[in-house]
Design a protein with these regions (language model features):
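Peripheral, non-catalytic segments flanking oxidoreductase cores
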Residues: 1-370
Length: 370
């Protein structure tokens, strides 16, 4: 599934990752001075919601609304993705990152491309580098797979990736419908949005676009000085994340009202066997007219376990405008955000990063918030 024109718009930092196996200490280039910008909640404290999608529909919709309004993220069980497929896609990801560095660099992401091996694209927004490496798959994985492995191994890798992408596509469409219904749309209205509206069946000519991102967080000799993935929001509708059995994902929970009582803390999302994590993306925040907020999240590293994660990042067709759903715009208040395409928003995010959402607010709304 190809995201048209995105390769022309995503031109972020593309330098090669560090050869992590060759270093015994964190170099200054990767030493972060502000890892503790917010406190981290204790393991017995706040918990990111877990939602069983096989439960009663009404109950699930209520839970989705609370999770999206309060957290912008949640874990799902009862999603129907075979556990064996999750194990195989984790093994496929580990197989990529276990290759020698010189082999991985043969599949390096070009400066003007989307797919391939390299650093996180958000690297250019930070003065320090991250303790991670990534492999992005937009469209078919065949070309890069043949660069990395002999034909039989490449075919096996591609089979797993394509099967996983298909499962994620179906789950993403299901979640989109349910989340729209949790906002107050009827089943017919949600169905119209996901089947006949701009979120269509999901082929190249129309429907949801998607990119699959494999992430690697190698063992770190000094995790208190390194950052796996810096804090950010996703430029998507939804991101479906499989984080295997090693913790590292943290989401930022804002507690209290505005003013002095307002505070934020990092909450670790514990791995759950077979569960998937759902992040609300920037585009869904626009779609919901700001009711559901995209979640700020990051990844921390550890000194004992090599962590991998697999993120399915989905959005609308490149030519489709994303704007607040009319039914969600209150009388007399107007939409908070102006219409924007996914490529247009990626271009804005590539320049403004964490100020991108504010930049697509309507002028009169922006003035009210200044």
């Amino acid at each position: 599934m190809i995201m048209p024109t995105a390769s022309e718009l995503i031109r972020h930092h593309h330098a090669h990752p560090l050869d992590f196996e060759s270093v015994r200490e964190v170099p200054d280039s990767h030493a972060w001075p502000d890892l503790h910008d917010h406190p981290t909640a204790s393991a017995q404290g706040a918990v990111v919601p877990v939602i069983d999608l096989s439960a009663t529909a009404t109950n699930v919709l209520e839970q989705l609304a609370r999770a999206c309004e309060s957290w912008g993220a949640f874990q799902v069980t009862g999603h129907g993705v075979p556990p064996g497929l999750l194990r195989r896609v984790e093994a496929a990801a580990r197989g990529v990152f276990a290759l020698p560095t010189n082999r991985k660099l043969e599949a390096a992401r070009p400066a003007d491309g989307v797919s391939g091996y390299g650093r996180a694209r958000i690297s250019c927004f930070f003065p320090k580098l991250m303790w991670s490496e990534g492999f992005t798959i937009a469209g078919s994985p065949v070309d890069h797979a043949r660069t990395l492995w002999p034909d039989d191994d490449a075919l096996a890798f591609c089979d797993v990736i394509e099967e996983y992408k298909e499962e994620m596509k179906q789950l993403a469409r299901k979640l989109m419908r349910m989340m729209l219904m949790s906002l107050g749309l009827t089943e017919a209205e949600a169905e119209a949005e996901t089947e006949t509206g701009w979120i269509g069946p999901g082929d190249e000519a129309g429907g949801m676009s998607a990119v699959l991102q494999l992430n690697s967080y190698p063992v770190c000799p000094d995790p208190d000085r390194a950052m796996g993935m810096a804090a950010h929001t996703d430029s998507t509708l939804l991101t479906l994340l499989f984080q295997s059995n090693t913790s590292g994902l943290q989401v930022l929970q804002v507690v209290g009202d505005t003013g002095r009582d307002r505070a934020a803390r990092w909450v670790t999302v514990p791995p759950m066997p077979g569960a998937l994590i759902v992040n609300v993306g920037d585009l869904f925040q626009i779609l919901s007219n700001g009711r559901y907020r995209s979640v700020i999240h990051r990844a921390v590293v550890n000194r004992t376990s090599h962590r991998v994660s697999v993120a399915y990042m989905c959005g609308p067709p490149a030519a489709s405008k994303v704007e607040p759903i009319v039914k969600l715009v209150g009388p007399g208040s107007g939409p908070v955000y102006r219409p924007v395409t996914w490529p247009e928003y990626l271009s804005v995010k590539g320049k403004l990063f964490d100020k991108a959402l504010a930049s697509v607010m309507r002028t009169e709304v922006s003035l009210e918030h200044t």
